[in-house]
């Protein structure tokens, strides 16, 4: 799946707010390295650096375009290309921070268990994931993909990512006598200029696997059909703007000292 740092950055303030909210719940760190997993263009990495300037910090991402943007943004930091599904976490780490990346990995709970085992005493795993598959933005991606003009491109392929497990699953799998786990949902309501802005937003994330699956000759048609559905699903308010509802799931797991 391809990513575009420039497209992602169009709504950077809105995308960064959940990272700020997540970081606010991270306690003081012990000695040890910190990692921004799925660092993207470095917006979340920048927050971690400001909060924990004394911790050795590395950003990990699988996309070269995102890594290039992150290195430009924070030239003195270390950024590495890595597949989080296969990445081996260093032992005695102080922080694994992940803003909007693990929703793409179906077996992420198992990965969380592995990350927690690599934490130093007092270390924290902090995760935020979009939990928006039941929102019109994502339901309409599937509906548009099922139209006769586009269905052949998606035949036999699963594009829609898997729904997140229940909050109880995370607590039951991750919490123990040695690990405290906090889980919560936050619903953000983003005021955007119009319905086209919603389309531009999801072009940077959720819509990308759908567009990647289509021949280049069909992408404009798919976007036009999708945009028409979005305009109906998100009518303008009295001020002319639209309100994008965006639920997100947060997890903070900290090993006892």
From Swiss-Prot:
Domain of life per record: Bacteria
Catalytic activities: trans-aconitate + S-adenosyl-L-methionine = (E)-3-(methoxycarbonyl)pent-2-enedioate + S-adenosyl-L-homocysteine
Enzyme's top EC category: transferase
Presence of keyword S-adenosyl-L-methionine: yes
GO cellular component labels: cytoplasm
Record EC number: 2.1.1.144
Subcellular location: Cytoplasm
Gene Ontology process terms (BP): methylation
The UniProt record lists the keyword Lipid biosynthesis: no
Any one GO MF annotation of this record: trans-aconitate 2-methyltransferase activity
Regions that span the bilayer: none
This protein's UniProt keywords: Cytoplasm, Methyltransferase, S-adenosyl-L-methionine, Transferase
Function: Catalyzes the S-adenosylmethionine monomethyl esterification of trans-aconitate.
Family per similarity comment: Belongs to the methyltransferase superfamily. Tam family.
NCBIfam families, per the entry: PRK01683.1
Name the record gives this protein: Trans-aconitate 2-methyltransferase
Species this protein is from: Rhizobium meliloti (strain 1021)
Gene it is expressed from: tam
